[in-house]
Amino acid sequence: MAHPSQLGLQDAASPVMEELLHFHDHALMIVFLISTLVFYIILAMMTTKMTDKYILDAQEIEIVWTLLPAIVLILVALPSLRILYLIDEVENPHLTIKAMGHQWYWSYEYTDYEELSFDSYMTPLQDLNPGQFRLLETDHRMVIPMESLIRVLISAEDVLHSWAVPALGVKMDAVPGRLNQITFMISRPGLYYGQCSEICGANHSFMPIVLEAIPLDPFEDWSSSMLEEAX
């Protein structure tokens, strides 16, 4: 969960987000080393007279400043491609949920259960309980089992939306007439908050996403009670 004045990323709650945190640190270290080298060169040129302003040809320097950027790009690209393929990999998901974006709320349909679907609206400020978060709470949470591979099919009814939960490292555009998918697995129980991440109109900031991860047995009890209410 994010907190005020936070500078870093949220704590990882999924294997994909853990990989993204490692990649962030890896890329940040490369950026730091490059910035240090550039700053040193600028400082050296400003503070010393030991520079040659009249070099017309230097094959060694040209080779170095061609190879170094290529090596840096490879060091950034390979881990990035690995994570991209990891995100796209879908194999025997335990649960499939369809998330549909509307102006301005989300609707969820558990396709593995008959008649298990609901709309999820933002909880108004006057209805919040102590300890709940403004603009982030919903009247119906998307409840899922922890340590299970979840596939979410994402689309939109009207305009472009985007379904994003930072702690899980997932973000996917919801496009009218198109079905996108993402997969993730939550490592521990808890509440995970997200928001629509594509400007979709006047109430774009009032489209929160709340995921509640619970063990499998309580999830089965919850789904049974929801089906009984629907019947």
UniProtKB/Swiss-Prot annotation:
Spans through the membrane: 15-45, 60-87
EC supergroup of this enzyme: translocase
Domain of life: Eukaryota
Documented EC number(s): 7.1.1.9
Keyword NADP listed: no
Catalytic function, reaction form: 4 Fe(II)-[cytochrome c] + O2 + 8 H(+)(in) = 4 Fe(III)-[cytochrome c] + 2 H2O + 4 H(+)(out)
Binding annotation for Cu cation A1: 161, 196, 200, 207
Cellular compartment(s): Mitochondrion inner membrane
Pfam families membership: COX2, COX2_TM
Binding of Mg(2+), residues: 198
GO MF term (any one): copper ion binding
BP GO annotations: ATP synthesis coupled electron transport
Keywords assigned: Copper, Electron transport, Magnesium, Membrane, Metal-binding, Mitochondrion, Mitochondrion inner membrane, Respiratory chain, Translocase, Transmembrane, Transmembrane helix, Transport
PROSITE patterns noted in UniProt: COX2, COX2_CUA, COX2_TM
Binding-site residues for Cu cation A2, renumbered to this chain: 196, 198, 200, 204
GO cellular component, one term: respiratory chain complex IV
Membrane topology term: Multi-pass membrane protein
All ranges on the Mitochondrial matrix side of the membrane: 46-59
Residues on Mitochondrial intermembrane side: 1-14, 88-231
NCBIfam families: CoxB (TIGR02866)
Subunit structure: Component of the cytochrome c oxidase (complex IV, CIV), a multisubunit enzyme composed of 14 subunits. The complex is composed of a catalytic core of 3 subunits MT-CO1, MT-CO2 and MT-CO3, encoded in the mitochondrial DNA, and 11 supernumerary subunits COX4I, COX5A, COX5B, COX6A, COX6B, COX6C, COX7A, COX7B, COX7C, COX8 and NDUFA4, which are encoded in the nuclear genome.
Role noted for this protein: Component of the cytochrome c oxidase, the last enzyme in the mitochondrial electron transport chain which drives oxidative phosphorylation. The respiratory chain contains 3 multisubunit complexes succinate dehydrogenase (complex II, CII), ubiquinol-cytochrome c oxidoreductase (cytochrome b-c1 complex, complex III, CIII) and cytochrome c oxidase (complex IV, CIV), that cooperate to transfer electrons derived from NADH and succinate to molecular oxygen, creating an electrochemical gradient over the inner membrane that drives transmembrane transport and the ATP synthase.
Similarity field: Belongs to the cytochrome c oxidase subunit 2 family.
PANTHER family associated with the record: CYTOCHROME C OXIDASE SUBUNIT 2 (PTHR22888:SF9), CYTOCHROME C OXIDASE, SUBUNIT II (PTHR22888)
Protein name: Cytochrome c oxidase subunit 2
Organism: Latimeria chalumnae (Coelacanth)
